[in-house]
Amino acid sequence: MGPAQITPHGATRIEVRAGSTTLAALRAEPVDPASAVAVLVPGYTGSKEDFAALLDPLRSAGLSVLAVDLPGQYESGGPDREDEYLPDPLGRTLAALVTDLACGGRQRVLLLGHSYGGLVARSAVLSGAPVTGLTLLGSGPGALPSGRRRALIDITEPVLRTEGIEVVQQLLETQDGIAEPPALAALLRARFLSSATAGLLGMAIGLRTEPDRVTELAAALRTAGVPCLVAFGEFDDAWPVPTQRAMALRLGAEIAVVPGAAHSPATENPDALLDALLPIWRRWLTAS
C-alpha cells in the first residue's frame, strides 16, 4: 500500500445523511455542472482517504465525487450491534444515500465499492439504490476465500474481542513489516483506532459468511438496465482473479484489469485505475 491516501486534493470534508445515519465524506465538485456523481465506498478497515488520489482527476473529468466512510469506519459513527455491519444493513444505509443523491432521477449516480465495500454496494443495488452504473473493485461473489487475508481476520478477531483494538493495531503493524511514510503511518493508525469495535467484528463476520448473490444481482441489474464493471488488480490476493472473472461473466459485466496493482488499485496504481474507469463510465453516461 503506497502513500496515495495522503495525496493532496481539493475535496472538502463534509458530513452526509444516509437515512438515519450520518457519514463522514470527502466531496469534490467540478467547475461546470457535473455529468454524474461518483460514490466511492471503501473496504474493510478502509476509509474515504483510500480514494484521495482519484478525487481531483475525477472532478477534472466532470464528475462530482463523494468518497465516504461507512458506518463505524474512521470518522463515521456507527451502531453497537455487530449484525448492523453486515452487507445487507450497510447496503440499506448506502441505498438511502444514493437515493437522496439521485434526486428522483435528476442526478445520475455511479456507484463504486472496493472489496467489502463491493459487497455493500451490491446490497445497496439489491435494496433499490437508483444507480446509473455499478463498479465492483477487487470484490467477490460472496465470502472471502481461504488465504492470507482470511487467516489474518481469523487471527485478529479473538484478540480484538479479548484484548481490544490497540493490541490488534500493534499486531497488525508487526505483521505488516513495511515502513510507511510517517504521515501515512499516522493516518492508518488513527483510522484503525477510531474504528468501531463492533464494526470491525461485524464486517469480519460478513467477510466470512456473505453468501453468493451474483445471480440475484445479475437479475436486478438486467431488470433495471444498469451496466456493471468488475475491476481488479492483476495481482489481487483477496478474491482470486479467476473468481472475479467468473463473477463478471455471470453478471454480464465488463472487466478491467489494473496493471501493477494487487487488492487495492486506488492506492497501488491510481493512474491506471483511472485509465480503466473513465472511458467505461463516460460510455455509460453517454448511453444513459
Predicted regions and their residues:
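Flexible "cap/lid" loop of the alpha/beta hydrolase fold
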Residues: R122-L126, P130-T162
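Conserved loop-alpha-helix segment in the C-terminal half of the alpha/beta-hydrolase fold
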Residues: T223-A261, T267
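Conserved HGGG/HGGXW glycine-rich cap/lid loop of the alpha/beta-hydrolase fold
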Residues: A24-G77
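Gly/Ala-rich beta-loop-alpha elbow adjacent to hydrolase catalytic centers
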Residues: G113-G117, A121
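Conserved alpha/beta-hydrolase catalytic His-Asp/Glu region
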Residues: L144-R150, G164-R222
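Active-site loop/oxyanion-hole signature of alpha/beta-hydrolase fold enzymes
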Residues: T21, A67-L112, D275
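Alpha/beta-hydrolase fold catalytic core
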Residues: M1-A38, S60-L63, C103, T162, ...
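Catalytic active-site module of serine/aspartate enzymes centered on a nucleophile-bearing elbow/loop
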Residues: G252-S288
